Amino acid sequence: MNLLDGKICIITGGGRGIGYTTAVKFAEEGAKVVIAEFDEKTGQKAADDVGGFFIQTNVADKFSVNSLFEKVMTEYGCVDVLVNNAGILMDGTLVKMEEDQFDAVINVNLKGVYLCGRGAATIMKEQGNGVILNASSVVAHNGNYGQTNYVATKAGVIGMTKVWARELGKDGIRVNAIAPGFITTEMIAQMPEKIIKMMREKVPVKRWGEPEDVANAYCFLASDEASYISGMVLNVDGGVVV
C-alpha cells in the first residue's frame, strides 16, 4: 500500500524486538528508515536488512541525540516520523531497587523520549508537519509488581504525549502513544513456561501479541490515514485494559 512512501522515519531502539519489526514494516510501506540504536552490531544489521541508515545513538545523552538529528538532516533534509521506541528494564521491588537502577531506567525510558521528542519537534515545527509516536505500556494504566521505575517512565510517557499533542498540534505535528500488552519477544521467551501460561490466561483473546501487531499500529498512526488522530494512547493488548 506504500502508506509511508518516501517518509523519513527515525526509530530509536530499532535494532531488535518491536523496534526492529517496526523498521521492517515501515520499509515495506515505502519509508526511508533511520535506525537509532545504541548497540552498533544490531543497529547496523537492522539498517542493512531494511535498506536504511544506521546512526549509533545513546538516547539518554543530549549530545548523542543532537548528533542524531544533525546527521539525519544532513542526509535527508527533513524528519517526517519519530518512533520513540528505545527502552530498558531493571526490575526490583521498591525496597530492593537501588537508586542507580531507578535512574538508569528513567534516563533511557523517560529522559530519552524527552530528548528525542524535543529534537524532532524542533525540526518538525520548521517544516510545518510531522508525527511523533511514543512507546508506553499497558502497565502504565494498572501498575506491575517489581517495576516502580519502568511503570513510572511509561506513565510519564503518556503524560508527555498528551502535553505535546496540545502544544504541537498548531504546528501540524501529531503526537500519539502505543501501549503494548504481552508481546512475544526475546525477553519474554526467557521466562518460565508456568509464568508464561499464567500471564497468557489474563489476556481475553487468549494469546500474546506479536511484534507485528505493534508495528502495524505504529504504521497506521504514522501514516496520513491517521491524520485526525492526536493525543491518543492506543492499547495493543488483546483486551487486557478495557
How should these model regions be labeled?
Residues 40-41, 57-67, 99, 212-213:
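The beta1-alpha1 cofactor-binding region of Rossmann-like NAD(H)/NADP(H)-dependent oxidoreductases
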Residues 114, 129, 207-236, 241:
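C-terminal substrate-recognition "lid" of short-chain dehydrogenase/reductases
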Residues 137:
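Residue(s) in the substrate-gating loop at a strand-loop-helix junction
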Residues 93-94, 98-106, 188, 199:
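Substrate-binding pocket helix/loop in short-chain dehydrogenase/reductase
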Residues 8, 15-17:
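Conserved glycine-rich cofactor-binding loop
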Residues 117, 153, 161:
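Active-site helix of classical SDR
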Residues 122, 166-170, 227:
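Alpha-helical segment proximal to the catalytic Tyr-Lys
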